[in-house]
């Protein structure tokens, strides 16, 4: 949406008088001289609306005004359209700034503006309001307590004290400062009135509440007396429907501002709040708070205007509220006035255009005083109209100023700044314009001479209104000295230049038309004759646009021949269809130019067909029509229709009717399509030079539905739980659904039965159906088959498959269940085999004593196994264990529960290796005894692993001593790992490296490297 425009023009015609009280024109005689560098005031800083806190300790306030001008400006202030009395001690000026000491609300509140002037004129600043801000304290009286039943909604009123301005922010204290309430879906503090809303009261809401009010404009905060809130307990809290109690009103806002809408509802349970813009999408800059109670629209635009709705809903009901946002716009310049110089006696068109909503009005100031309203036209104006002008656009929401200085020029003609060229070149037979542009006001009269001969207008010679001299059909005799004379009522002046005649530039070898195929090269020749005293350049253009040979993309295809003088030959390499068109060679000097053109035809594959339309949509075919594209100078031989379904990103050639679409056809059918499938279509054309670009794809269409014609595959099943028949199949992919309401019909009967039982499965993605029948005999053979259906009919049945119904779960529980505690983390469980043939596996369930049975872990073993090992158990922990027999139908009854305890954890301290000493052909490794902690298993011995460095396997020793002898390695390094052993398992490892070299290097003998090592167990240990 665009804001309306207001256009105002200042038209100055025949400027004729003087400036009045300003004297600058007197200094310069009859007008502004060329040396005049002065200018009127231009504001660099203007006063802004200011709020002075009544309780401020500063004791003064400043309103700023600063202008740039030459000479320096003089400043003056006005308040409520009266002059500010600067003789009063309370007022002072610092530069252009007004300083008010000890501001008084009764005397100083009002509207201020600044005037800045010098001898060029006066300008008036924007208006600024000085107001006095305050925030009174809350009344000292105590606030009564509030009692509310739990589950009911509640509002605590803030009732803020008297204040100015209105931009307050609100928070609520709970019991003490600075504990503030956090807003959520249940609690909301309105920033409109400050009230605290609780959707439904809970017992946790009990406490003392205080409304905390802040005024950011005067940086002051106050808070109310505390309000005791006492929730009344209820046996059961009754739900009640949503009730919107915080409602937003119709608002008018300004474009570019941020808008906040509040909406909060009481209700039990807490209502959910949703926002929408009625009949339109929400603004892209809209944000909804986490609680949902606040909608913020940032940088609102005109198109965001409209009706907004919030809806609150819980399980008991919903409530709605609507209000409208009206978006207005500050005035904004579309075109404004600028500093302007005009000749005395001339005309001026000075536009002033503003936009806004509502439409702004235009008024004018001259030298700070009201001058005119609306469109301003000035006739027959002189020096009196010079000065500072201000165009003011204003509506109900704002005012903008455009300032400009109007200078009146009055001076005798002078060529000092712009003399005639001393030497002018012109080609024989051509045309020349000799400019004559002196500075003069009013506009002078012009005359010309050649040598001693006065020139007058003729068929070849024309003196323009601006003083320029035009000569056509130039001959050698036109060469010579020319003088321009300019005269006005202020004086006269002249300027002289010499016209030199040169030979004309002519194309002597023009480019000729060419006809090529895509990928070939073409040469455009061009040569010219020219005056030898001048430099010649060639410029090539394509279809009216100059070819830029410096661009990398251009250099790929265009190349110029610089080898020959006066030759501008152009080579077009690897030409493409886009290079076909008109090429123009221009030979040019600084004096004249000559051009010649030729056409390049590039033959290639056809362009894309256009206007593709889809008609007569059926289940397996559609009719297509299109319009013929460009044949690119080679007749189209055939068309190809291509399709793409919603299930694929690839385009494929479609089968068509007729099978071959001749090049003179513009319609055909695509056949053998999939029913009830979404398709896109496109058409490509082919000629002898290749296949062209495809047409723009059609809109996506869906073919009509049809009954399925594909049967499900992989029909089978069996297994399941007691009294179940499980039937499975491979679901048909989406492309074979062929219609809406797709599903499956499952048919089954006992192997020797006569009558088929049929059931309907409506889920198109499922491939499984389970039939439950308490009378069904376990492990009974059934014949099954499946077919698909949709709203158009049924498809064919699949091949018949034979499956068995589920067998019964085992009926006996394992007996003689026993356990053996192996360590702190392992238990071995064993049981007696169940004799039933239908047992396929055993399941061991176990759980810790501090856990519930529902959290039990499970271990499954085959029916041939009668024991299992439980690992990763907690040390020193009570466990319960039971065993059950299972098959595909489920598990039978469990055994009696066995209670047992894991052993304490193994020692956590590694053995500290004291020494590693070589003695003859052996090493003696010695370590400290490991003492177990109170919650650890007692050390019963030590395990020593002797292995090559870098390998995990080695030789394992055990001992009750604190040392061991191991052989010296034959070659390389070995690692000796030592760990304590206990009933709870093996402890943490220590290790040392030993070497097989004759002299033991201290660097190879590392003392204790505590870590959790890789533990290798051997059955013989």
UniProtKB/Swiss-Prot annotation:
GO cellular component terms listed in the entry, alphabetical order: axon; glutamatergic synapse; plasma membrane; postsynaptic membrane; presynaptic membrane; side of membrane; synapse
Propeptide: 1002-1021
Organism: Rattus norvegicus
Superkingdom assignment: Eukaryota
UniProt-annotated stretches for the region Disordered: 695-719
Assigned protein family: Belongs to the immunoglobulin superfamily. Contactin family.
Fibronectin type-III domain sequence ranges: 608-706, 711-808, 813-908, 909-1002
Known tissue expression: Expressed by neurons, oligodendrocytes and their progenitors (at protein level). Myelination regulates the expression being down-regulated when neurons are in contact with Schwann cells.
Glycosylation site list: 208, 258, 338, 457, 473, 494, 521, 593, 935
Gene symbol of the encoding locus: Cntn1
Domain Ig-like C2-type: residue ranges: 41-131, 137-223, 241-326, 331-407, 413-500, 504-603
Sorted UniProt keywords: Cell adhesion, Cell membrane, Disulfide bond, Glycoprotein, GPI-anchor, Immunoglobulin domain, Lipoprotein, Membrane, Notch signaling pathway, Repeat, Signal
Protein name: Contactin-1
Localization of this protein: Cell membrane
Entry's Gene Ontology BP terms: axon guidance; cell-cell adhesion; central nervous system myelin formation; cerebellum development; gene expression; locomotory behavior; myelination; neuron projection development
Signal peptide: 1-20
GO MF: carbohydrate binding; cell-cell adhesion mediator activity
């Amino acid at each position: 949406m665009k804001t309306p425009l207001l256009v105002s023009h200042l038209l100055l015609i025949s400027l004729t008088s003087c400036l009045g009280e300003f004297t600058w024109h007197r200094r310069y005689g009859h007008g502004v001289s060329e040396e005049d560098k002065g200018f009127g005031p231009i504001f660099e800083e203007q006063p802004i609306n200011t709020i002075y806190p009544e309780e401020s300790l500063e004791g003064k306030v400043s309103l700023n005004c600063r202008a740039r001008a030459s000479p320096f400006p003089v400043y003056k202030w006005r308040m409520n359209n009266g002059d500010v009395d600067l003789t009063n001690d309370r007022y002072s000026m610092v530069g252009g700034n007004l300083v008010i000491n000890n501001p008084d609300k009764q005397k100083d509140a009002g509207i201020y503006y600044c005037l800045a002037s010098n001898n060029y004129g006066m300008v008036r600043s924007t208006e600024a309001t000085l107001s006095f801000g305050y925030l009174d304290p809350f009344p000292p009286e105590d606030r009564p307590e509030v009692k509310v039943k739990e589950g009911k909604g509640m509002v605590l009123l803030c009732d803020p004290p008297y204040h100015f301005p209105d931009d307050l922010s609100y928070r609520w204290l709970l019991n003490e400062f600075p504990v503030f309430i956090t807003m959520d879906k249940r609690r909301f503090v309105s920033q409109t009135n400050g009230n605290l809303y609780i959707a439904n009261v809970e017992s946790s809401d009990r406490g003392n509440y205080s409304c905390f009010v802040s005024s950011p404009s005067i940086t002051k905060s106050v808070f109310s007396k505390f309000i005791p809130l006492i929730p009344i307990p209820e046996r059961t809290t009754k739900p009640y429907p949503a009730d919107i109690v915080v409602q937003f009103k119709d608002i008018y806002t300004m474009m570019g501002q941020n808008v906040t809408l509040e909406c909060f509802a009481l209700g039990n349970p807490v209502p959910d709040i949703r926002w929408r813009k009625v009949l339109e999408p929400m603004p892209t800059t809209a944000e909804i708070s986490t609680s949902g109670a606040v909608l913020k629209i940032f940088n609102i635009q005109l198109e965001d205007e409209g009706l907004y709705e919030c809806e609150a809903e819980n399980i008991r009901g919903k409530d709605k509220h609507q209000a409208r946002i009206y978006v207005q716009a500050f005035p904004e310049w579309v075109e404004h006035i600028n500093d302007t110089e005009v000749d005395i006696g001339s005309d001026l068109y000075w536009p002033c255009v503003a936009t806004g909503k509502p439409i702004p009005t235009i008024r004018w100031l001259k030298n700070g005083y009201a001058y005119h309203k609306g469109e301003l036209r000035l006739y027959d104006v002189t020096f009196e109209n010079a000065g500072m002008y201000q165009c003011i656009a204003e509506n109900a929401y704002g005012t903008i100023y455009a300032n400009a200085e109007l200078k009146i020029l009055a001076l005798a003609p002078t060529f000092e700044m712009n003399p005639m060229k001393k030497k002018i070149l012109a080609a024989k037979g051509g045309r020349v314009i000799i400019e004559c542009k002196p500075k003069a006001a009013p506009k002078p009269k012009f005359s010309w001479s050649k040598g001693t001969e006065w020139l007058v207008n003729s068929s070849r010679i024309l003196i323009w209104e601006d003083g320029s001299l035009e000569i056509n059909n130039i001959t050698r005799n036109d060469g010579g000295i020319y003088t321009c004379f300019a005269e006005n009522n202020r004086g006269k002046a002249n300027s002289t230049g010499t016209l030199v005649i040169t030979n004309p530039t002519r194309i002597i070898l023009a480019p000729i038309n060419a006809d090529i195929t895509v990928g070939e090269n073409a040469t455009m020749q061009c040569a010219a004759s020219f005056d030898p005293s001048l430099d010649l350049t060639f410029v090539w253009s394509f279809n009216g646009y100059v070819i830029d040979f410096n661009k990398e993309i251009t250099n790929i295809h265009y190349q110029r021949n610089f080898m020959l003088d006066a030759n501008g030959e152009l080579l077009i390499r690897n030409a493409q269809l886009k290079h076909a068109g008109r090429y123009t060679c221009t030979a040019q000097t600084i004096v004249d130019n000559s051009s010649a053109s030729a056409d390049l035809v590039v033959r290639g594959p056809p362009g894309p067909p256009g206007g593709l339309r889809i008609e007569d949509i059926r289940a397996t075919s559609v009719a297509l029509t299109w319009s013929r594209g460009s044949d690119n100078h080679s007749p189209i031989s055939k068309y190809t229709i291509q399709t793409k379904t919603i299930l694929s990103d690839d385009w494929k050639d479609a089968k068509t009717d007729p099978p071959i679409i001749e090049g003179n056809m513009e319609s055909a059918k695509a056949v053998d399509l999939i029913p009830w499938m979404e398709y896109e279509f496109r058409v490509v054309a082919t000629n002898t030079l290749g296949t062209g670009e495809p047409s723009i794809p059609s809109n996506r269409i869906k073919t009509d539905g049809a009954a399925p014609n594909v049967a499900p595959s992989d029909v089978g099943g069996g297994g399941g739980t007691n009294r179940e028949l499980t039937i499975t199949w491979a679901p048909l992919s989406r492309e074979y659904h062929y219609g809406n309401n797709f599903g499956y019909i499952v048919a089954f009967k006992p192997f020797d039965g006569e009558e088929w039982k049929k059931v309907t499965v409506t889920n198109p993605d499922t491939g499984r159906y389970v039939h439950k029948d308490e009378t069904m005999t376990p492990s009974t053979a059934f014949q099954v088959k499946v077919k698909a259906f949709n709203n158009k009919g049924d498809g064919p049945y699949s091949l018949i498959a034979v499956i068995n119904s589920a067998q019964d779960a085992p009926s006996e529980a394992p007996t003689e269940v026993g356990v053996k505690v192996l360590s702190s983390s392992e238990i071995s469980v064993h049981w007696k085999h169940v004799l039933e043939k239908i047992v396929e596996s055993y399941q061991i369930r176990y759980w810790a004593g501090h856990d519930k049975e529902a959290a039990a872990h499970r271990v499954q073993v085959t029916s041939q196994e009668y024991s299992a090992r439980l690992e990763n158990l907690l040390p020193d922990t009570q466990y319960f264990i039971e065993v059950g027999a299972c098959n595909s139908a489920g598990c039978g009854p469990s055994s009696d529960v066995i209670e047992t305890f894991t052993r304490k954890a193994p020692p956590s301290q590694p053995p500290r290796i004291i020494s590693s000493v070589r003695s003859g052909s052996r090493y003696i490794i010695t370590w400290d005894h490991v003492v177990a902690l109170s919650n650890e298993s007692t050390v019963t011995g030590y395990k020593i692993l002797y292995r090559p460095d870098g390998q995990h396997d080695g030789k394992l020793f055990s001992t009750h001593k604190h040392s061991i002898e191991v052989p010296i390695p034959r070659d390389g390094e070995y690692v000796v790992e030592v760990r304590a052993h206990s009933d709870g398992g093996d402890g943490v490892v220590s290790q040392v490296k030993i070497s097989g070299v004759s002299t033991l290097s201290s660097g190879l003998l590392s003392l204790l490297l505590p870590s959790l090592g890789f533990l290798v167990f051997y059955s013989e240990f």
